[in-house]
Amino acid sequence: MTAKGLRRIKIKKRIRKYIFGTAERPRLTVFRSNRQIYSQLIDDSTGNTLVVASSLGITEKVSKKKIAYRTGVLVAQKAKEVGIRSVVFDRNGYLYHGRVKELADAAREEGLKF
């Protein structure tokens, strides 16, 4: 693993001590690969994943930031269908910049509170 990857995992473990999702306020976690972006709402008290959204279904040729924005809209819409309005944001060790920020901003604009 690269030094950058090890740094992210170290930050992720440090942050996870303080971030905990419940059924009323689940944890919105983000995973970013080179091509795709994934997000899920997790209830840490039971270990269940409540909602999943990813960029795998988006086939348009647009920028990665626009794809992340659409994924944020998608996860917020799915959360509303389940009845979730408030979440705890877990950036998973990534910097709050670029695609991670776009996903978070889109989820906020669609009505999720965090």
Curated annotation (Swiss-Prot):
One GO-annotated biological process of the protein: translation
GO molecular function: 5S rRNA binding; structural constituent of ribosome
Pfam families: Ribosomal_L18p
Keywords (A to Z) from UniProt: Ribonucleoprotein, Ribosomal protein, RNA-binding, rRNA-binding
GO cellular component labels: cytosolic large ribosomal subunit
Xref: SUPFAM superfamilies: Translational machinery components
InterPro entries: Ribosomal_uL18_bac-type (IPR004389), Ribosomal_uL18_bac/euk (IPR005484)
TM annotation in the entry: none
Gene3D superfamilies documented for this protein: 3.30.420.100
Record's keyword annotation contains Ribosomal protein: yes
Function of the protein: This is one of the proteins that bind and probably mediate the attachment of the 5S RNA into the large ribosomal subunit, where it forms part of the central protuberance.
Binding partners and assembly: Part of the 50S ribosomal subunit; part of the 5S rRNA/L5/L18/L25 subcomplex. Contacts the 5S and 23S rRNAs.
Family (UniProt): Belongs to the universal ribosomal protein uL18 family.
Name of the protein described by the UniProt record: Large ribosomal subunit protein uL18
Taxonomic classification: Bacteria, Pseudomonadati, Bacteroidota, Bacteroidia, Bacteroidales
